[in-house]
Amino acid sequence: MLSLLGATTLMLVAGRWVLPAASGEANLKSENVEIHIIDDNFFLKWNSSSESVRNVTFSADYQILGTDNWKKLPGCQHITSSKCNFSSVELKDVFEKIELRIRAEEGNNTSTWYEVEPFVPFLKAQIGPPDVHLEAEDKAIILSISPPGTEDSIMWALDRSSFRYSVVIWKNSSSLEERTETVYPEDKIYKLSPEITYCLKVKAELRLQSRVGCYSPVYCINTTERHKVPSPENVQINVDNQAYVLKWDYPYESTTFQAQWLRAFLKKIPGKHSNKWKQIPNCENVTTTHCVFPRDIFSMGIYYVRVRASNGNGTSFWSEEKEFNTEVKPIIFPPVISMKSITDDSLHVSVSASEESENMSVNQLYPLVYEVIFWENTSNAERKVLEKRTDFTFPNLKPLTVYCVKARALIENDRWNKGSSYSDTVCEKTKPGNTSKTWLIAGICTALFSILVVIYVVRVFLRCVKYVFFPSSKPPSSVDQYFSDQPLRNLLLSTSEEQTERCFIIENASIITEIEETNEVAEVHEEYNSQASQDSGNYSNEDENSGSKISEEFLQQDSV
């Protein structure tokens, strides 16, 4: 038992006590005085330097603080060793302070008393290891745990039903696959494999006091071979209007089922509870994998249910026990999510109730909160937030980026974390930012400029092609100016006309003078017309012949 000591000890460094020095005797002294309390076991231990002195014993007294009534400490009188057990001391109250004193003795000689600092037994007590009993099934182990101490323990009399037990279990063949579970005094460990040796150890805890006990010794047991009739699995209980619906999975037909219930608080009380399970109405000898029973069977509280199967070959073990709370069991459907981009760096999210949700009392009786998971579509990094509002905004986002969101409804301040499944995932892209607009405008302008440049280059290219392969029938103006004089225009006349000489018989000299003046005017007019027609590239004989026509007219008039 002393090997278990060490977590909660009272260690005192005592001064020496000295026996009267006699002839050949040495001084006697004590060094570390320690008090250990485990459950209802009390131990006093000290170190002494008087081993070389023979016939030295030690005795201790105790008293309740403030009574001034020292009594001999049972089990600690005339002790020759350096420890004693005073568990037989009769203490009426473990919350009262106790004083201890100890001295050394040799014959009729005694040292002075050394008084230990007063202590409260309950505050110094260490929780001891619980006692464990095991029973095996094919896929489970039944635990029966006795609280630390004895049935009439004074130390834990008020806490026997407050203990919680932590179990560490592993396969005997591999200690690396350890699994830790919190269990009740009468409980089961599920999800095991048939015909496997499992080992476990258990420790007790008082969570409200933050006190943790010692582990029990290691216990090992073999699970049985696979049972011929398997147990039902995936037991669930839901609410449908004014009734409960209990469902489970089972692989075979032609099987009957039975379901039972138990109040949850009974599992906290040590002892057997197999006879306290009660039959659920309408769930006995049913041939379907579900049964329906009225809600008024259960008052407000927490319960456990279990199911087992039967056929002509036998009866299965009980299924895994399912806990449910009558206050929060109504079904919560997943919400409907919508998301809209409002700016370049924010998205607005709206949460609404599902159309399938018919039990509106859930929203009225229990306030809901929404667990929202938000992430960038190209990233696995998720942001999880709890929102009481049905409309909220995610700010500080990237422009032109796709974000996704999903959510589920939870009952606020629910310690069992009951909630719906997650909604469908909704994704939305943020709007372009100012920088994006600037780049967009710049891109459009660049594209337009590029188009104009391309058009200009194409036109120049086409003109070059036309000039090379399809030249104009008219000579250019620079060439045409050399052909603007009168002698050159005569080249365009026919050969016959060029070789013809015109002769005139002039009888009146005055007419000749008028004709010459007229010809001078015509020449001036011709020169003007020639300059005006150089750019057009057109050649005309009209001006060239105008002089001759005028001369002919004058001749005709003269002849008349």
From Swiss-Prot:
SUPFAM superfamilies the UniProt entry points to: Fibronectin type III
Compartments in which it is found: Cell membrane; Late endosome; Lysosome
Record lineage: Eukaryota, Metazoa, Chordata, Craniata, Vertebrata
Biological process per Gene Ontology, one example term: cellular response to interferon-alpha
Protein family membership: Belongs to the type II cytokine receptor family.
Quaternary structure (record): Heterodimer with IFNAR2; forming the receptor for type I interferon. Interacts with TYK2. Interacts with STAT1 and STAT2; the interaction requires its phosphorylation at Tyr-482. Interacts (serine-phosphorylated form) with FBXW11, the substrate recognition component of a SCF (SKP1-CUL1-F-box protein) E3 ubiquitin-protein ligase complex. Interacts with SHMT2; this promotes interaction with ABRAXAS2 and the BRISC complex. Interacts with TRIM10; this interaction prevents association between IFNAR1 and TYK2.
Modified positions (Phosphotyrosine) in chain numbering: 467, 482
One MF term in the entry's GO annotations: type I interferon binding
Record Pfam families: Interfer-bind, Tissue_fac
Residue pairs linked by disulfide bridges in the UniProt entry: 76-84, 199-220, 283-291, 404-427
TM annotation in the entry: 438-458
Function (record text): Together with IFNAR2, forms the heterodimeric receptor for type I interferons (including interferons alpha, beta, epsilon, omega and kappa). Type I interferon binding activates the JAK-STAT signaling cascade, resulting in transcriptional activation or repression of interferon-regulated genes that encode the effectors of the interferon response. Mechanistically, type I interferon-binding brings the IFNAR1 and IFNAR2 subunits into close proximity with one another, driving their associated Janus kinases (JAKs) (TYK2 bound to IFNAR1 and JAK1 bound to IFNAR2) to cross-phosphorylate one another.
Protein name as annotated: Interferon alpha/beta receptor 1
Domain of life: Eukaryota
Entry comment describing in which tissues the protein is expressed: Expressed in the endometrium. Expressed in all tissues examined except conceptus at day 15 of pregnancy.
Domain Fibronectin type-III positions: 126-226, 231-329, 333-433
Topological relation to the membrane, as annotated: Single-pass type I membrane protein
Region of interest: Important for interaction with TYK2: 492-501
Lipidated residues (S-palmitoyl cysteine): 464
Region feature Disordered, mapped onto this chain: 524-560
Organism of this sequence: Ovis aries
Compositionally skewed regions (Polar residues) per UniProt: 529-540
Signal sequence range: 1-24
Positions on the Extracellular side per record topology: 25-437
PTM comment: Ubiquitinated, leading to its internalization and degradation. Polyubiquitinated via 'Lys-48'-linked and 'Lys-63'-linked ubiquitin chains, leading to receptor internalization and lysosomal degradation. The 'Lys-63'-linked ubiquitin chains are cleaved off by the BRISC complex.
Keywords associated with the record: Cell membrane, Disulfide bond, Endosome, Glycoprotein, Lipoprotein, Lysosome, Membrane, Palmitate, Phosphoprotein, Receptor, Repeat, Signal, Transmembrane, Transmembrane helix, Ubl conjugation
Membrane topology, Cytoplasmic segments: 459-560
